[in-house]
Protein backbone atom coordinates (compact mmCIF):
# COMPACT_ATOMS: atom_id res chain seq x y z
CA UNK A 1 0.00 0.00 0.00
CA UNK A 2 1.48 3.36 -1.10
CA UNK A 3 0.22 6.54 0.54
CA UNK A 4 1.74 9.77 -0.80
CA UNK A 5 1.73 12.94 1.32
CA UNK A 6 2.30 15.76 -1.14
CA UNK A 7 4.32 18.90 -0.70
CA UNK A 8 2.24 22.05 -1.08
CA UNK A 9 2.50 25.79 -1.32
CA UNK A 10 2.66 27.36 2.11
CA UNK A 11 -0.30 29.39 3.39
CA UNK A 12 -0.32 33.04 2.36
CA UNK A 13 2.00 35.05 4.56
CA UNK A 14 4.31 32.13 5.33
CA UNK A 15 7.97 33.00 4.80
CA UNK A 16 9.20 29.69 3.37
CA UNK A 17 6.79 29.38 0.44
CA UNK A 18 6.63 25.56 0.59
CA UNK A 19 5.30 23.03 3.05
CA UNK A 20 7.05 19.67 2.70
CA UNK A 21 5.07 16.46 3.13
CA UNK A 22 6.84 15.68 6.43
CA UNK A 23 5.46 18.90 7.94
CA UNK A 24 1.86 17.77 7.32
CA UNK A 25 1.76 15.55 10.41
CA UNK A 26 -2.05 15.68 10.51
CA UNK A 27 -2.08 13.75 7.22
CA UNK A 28 0.22 10.89 8.20
CA UNK A 29 0.48 10.63 12.01
CA UNK A 30 -2.91 8.82 12.19
CA UNK A 31 -1.45 6.15 9.86
CA UNK A 32 1.36 5.50 12.35
CA UNK A 33 -0.72 5.10 15.49
CA UNK A 34 -0.18 1.68 17.10
CA UNK A 35 2.28 0.58 14.41
CA UNK A 36 6.01 -0.06 14.29
CA UNK A 37 7.51 2.61 12.06
CA UNK A 38 10.70 2.68 9.98
CA UNK A 39 12.03 5.62 8.00
CA UNK A 40 14.17 5.87 4.87
CA UNK A 41 15.88 9.16 5.57
CA UNK A 42 19.06 11.19 5.38
CA UNK A 43 20.34 14.66 6.26
CA UNK A 44 17.66 16.31 4.07
CA UNK A 45 14.79 14.82 6.10
CA UNK A 46 14.02 18.04 7.95
CA UNK A 47 10.86 19.64 9.24
CA UNK A 48 11.89 23.23 9.86
CA UNK A 49 14.97 23.10 12.10
CA UNK A 50 14.27 19.54 13.32
CA UNK A 51 15.16 16.20 11.76
CA UNK A 52 12.15 13.98 10.97
CA UNK A 53 13.54 11.18 13.16
CA UNK A 54 13.79 13.55 16.14
CA UNK A 55 10.24 14.81 15.48
CA UNK A 56 8.87 11.25 15.37
CA UNK A 57 10.78 10.25 18.51
CA UNK A 58 9.65 13.37 20.41
CA UNK A 59 6.04 12.74 19.32
CA UNK A 60 6.00 9.21 20.76
CA UNK A 61 5.97 7.36 17.42
CA UNK A 62 7.21 3.77 17.84
CA UNK A 63 10.29 4.13 15.64
CA UNK A 64 12.00 0.75 15.17
CA UNK A 65 14.41 1.29 12.26
CA UNK A 66 16.14 3.95 10.21
CA UNK A 67 17.25 2.97 6.70
CA UNK A 68 20.03 5.08 5.24
CA UNK A 69 20.90 5.54 1.54
CA UNK A 70 24.18 6.51 -0.14
CA UNK A 71 26.17 9.05 1.92
CA UNK A 72 24.67 7.65 5.17
CA UNK A 73 21.96 8.85 7.53
CA UNK A 74 23.72 12.12 8.38
CA UNK A 75 25.08 12.63 4.83
CA UNK A 76 28.75 12.57 5.80
CA UNK A 77 30.04 9.71 3.59
CA UNK A 78 31.60 10.37 0.19
CA UNK A 79 29.92 9.32 -3.06
CA UNK A 80 30.11 5.55 -3.46
CA UNK A 81 31.67 5.07 0.00
CA UNK A 82 30.36 2.04 1.86
CA UNK A 83 28.52 2.97 5.05
CA UNK A 84 28.20 0.57 8.00
CA UNK A 85 24.98 0.09 9.94
CA UNK A 86 24.98 1.71 13.38
CA UNK A 87 22.71 3.22 16.03
CA UNK A 88 21.36 6.78 16.05
CA UNK A 89 22.98 8.47 19.06
CA UNK A 90 20.03 10.79 19.71
CA UNK A 91 17.23 8.20 19.70
CA UNK A 92 18.92 4.81 20.12
CA UNK A 93 17.14 3.56 16.97
CA UNK A 94 19.11 1.11 14.77
CA UNK A 95 20.36 2.60 11.49
CA UNK A 96 20.37 -0.04 8.75
CA UNK A 97 22.59 0.95 5.85
CA UNK A 98 21.40 0.27 2.32
CA UNK A 99 24.86 1.22 1.07
CA UNK A 100 27.18 -1.12 2.98
CA UNK A 101 28.82 -2.74 -0.04
CA UNK A 102 27.15 -6.12 0.52
CA UNK A 103 23.54 -5.59 -0.45
CA UNK A 104 21.33 -2.67 -1.37
CA UNK A 105 18.20 -4.48 -0.19
CA UNK A 106 17.26 -4.78 3.49
CA UNK A 107 17.54 -8.15 5.22
CA UNK A 108 14.47 -10.21 6.05
CA UNK A 109 15.12 -9.48 9.73
CA UNK A 110 15.12 -5.73 9.05
CA UNK A 111 11.89 -6.00 7.05
CA UNK A 112 10.17 -7.84 9.92
CA UNK A 113 11.07 -5.00 12.33
CA UNK A 114 8.39 -2.58 11.12
CA UNK A 115 4.82 -2.29 9.82
CA UNK A 116 4.96 0.99 7.89
CA UNK A 117 7.81 2.78 6.13
CA UNK A 118 8.05 6.58 5.88
CA UNK A 119 10.17 7.84 2.98
CA UNK A 120 11.51 11.40 3.25
CA UNK A 121 14.54 12.45 1.20
CA UNK A 122 15.16 15.43 -1.04
CA UNK A 123 15.82 14.50 -4.65
CA UNK A 124 17.39 16.88 -7.17
CA UNK A 125 15.64 15.52 -10.24
CA UNK A 126 18.59 13.71 -11.84
CA UNK A 127 18.33 10.14 -13.10
CA UNK A 128 21.73 9.15 -11.67
CA UNK A 129 20.94 10.51 -8.18
CA UNK A 130 20.76 7.33 -6.07
CA UNK A 131 18.13 8.33 -3.49
CA UNK A 132 15.16 7.46 -5.70
CA UNK A 133 16.81 4.11 -6.49
CA UNK A 134 17.12 3.32 -2.76
CA UNK A 135 13.46 4.25 -2.38
CA UNK A 136 12.43 1.94 -5.24
CA UNK A 137 14.36 -0.96 -3.71
CA UNK A 138 12.72 -0.36 -0.33
CA UNK A 139 9.30 -0.16 -1.97
CA UNK A 140 9.93 -3.50 -3.70
CA UNK A 141 10.94 -5.08 -0.38
CA UNK A 142 7.86 -3.58 1.31
CA UNK A 143 5.64 -5.06 -1.42
CA UNK A 144 7.26 -8.48 -0.86
CA UNK A 145 6.66 -8.27 2.91
CA UNK A 146 3.23 -6.61 2.83
CA UNK A 147 4.46 -3.40 4.46
CA UNK A 148 2.75 -0.04 3.93
CA UNK A 149 4.79 2.84 2.48
CA UNK A 150 4.10 6.54 3.07
CA UNK A 151 6.06 8.89 0.79
CA UNK A 152 6.53 12.34 2.32
CA UNK A 153 7.08 14.30 -0.86
CA UNK A 154 9.37 17.31 -1.30
CA UNK A 155 9.33 19.73 -4.23
CA UNK A 156 11.95 19.20 -6.89
CA UNK A 157 14.42 22.13 -7.00
CA UNK A 158 14.76 21.68 -10.78
CA UNK A 159 11.14 22.74 -11.15
CA UNK A 160 9.79 21.96 -14.60
CA UNK A 161 13.15 21.60 -16.38
CA UNK A 162 13.47 18.33 -18.34
CA UNK A 163 16.54 17.45 -20.41
CA UNK A 164 18.60 14.58 -21.79
CA UNK A 165 17.89 11.17 -23.26
CA UNK A 166 15.58 8.64 -21.64
CA UNK A 167 17.48 5.70 -20.14
CA UNK A 168 17.60 2.62 -22.36
CA UNK A 169 16.71 -0.08 -19.81
CA UNK A 170 19.41 -2.43 -21.10
CA UNK A 171 21.72 -0.04 -19.17
CA UNK A 172 19.73 -0.18 -15.92
CA UNK A 173 22.09 0.05 -12.93
CA UNK A 174 22.59 1.49 -9.47
CA UNK A 175 22.79 4.96 -11.04
CA UNK A 176 19.84 4.61 -13.41
CA UNK A 177 16.82 2.47 -12.63
CA UNK A 178 13.90 3.89 -14.62
CA UNK A 179 13.27 4.91 -18.23
CA UNK A 180 13.35 8.64 -17.44
CA UNK A 181 15.40 11.54 -18.89
CA UNK A 182 18.70 12.58 -17.30
CA UNK A 183 16.96 15.62 -15.78
CA UNK A 184 13.40 14.58 -14.96
CA UNK A 185 12.12 17.91 -13.68
CA UNK A 186 8.82 17.92 -11.81
CA UNK A 187 8.47 14.14 -11.59
CA UNK A 188 7.99 13.29 -7.91
CA UNK A 189 8.87 10.02 -6.19
CA UNK A 190 5.27 8.90 -6.45
CA UNK A 191 5.16 9.56 -10.19
CA UNK A 192 8.47 7.75 -10.68
CA UNK A 193 7.05 4.66 -9.02
CA UNK A 194 3.82 4.85 -11.00
CA UNK A 195 5.89 5.14 -14.18
CA UNK A 196 7.94 2.07 -13.29
CA UNK A 197 4.91 -0.11 -12.52
CA UNK A 198 2.78 1.18 -15.40
Regions found by a protein language model. Name each.
Residues 75-79, 150-172:
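Glycine-rich, charge-decorated loop segments at or immediately adjacent to ligand/cofactor-binding or catalytic sites
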Residues 169-188:
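Acidic, His- and aromatic-enriched active-site or binding-groove loops in soluble protein domains
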Residues 123-133:
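Glycine/threonine-rich flexible loop motifs
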Residues 64-70:
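Short internal beta-strands
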Residues 84-113:
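Glycine-rich oxoanion-binding loops at beta->alpha junctions
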Residues 18-61:
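N-terminal phosphate-binding or glycine-rich loops at protein starts, especially the Walker A/P-loop
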Residues 61, 145-148:
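A short helix->loop->beta-strand "cap" motif at the edges of active sites that frequently abuts
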Residues 191-194, 198:
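Single conserved hydrophobic/aromatic residue that forms the stacking wall/gate
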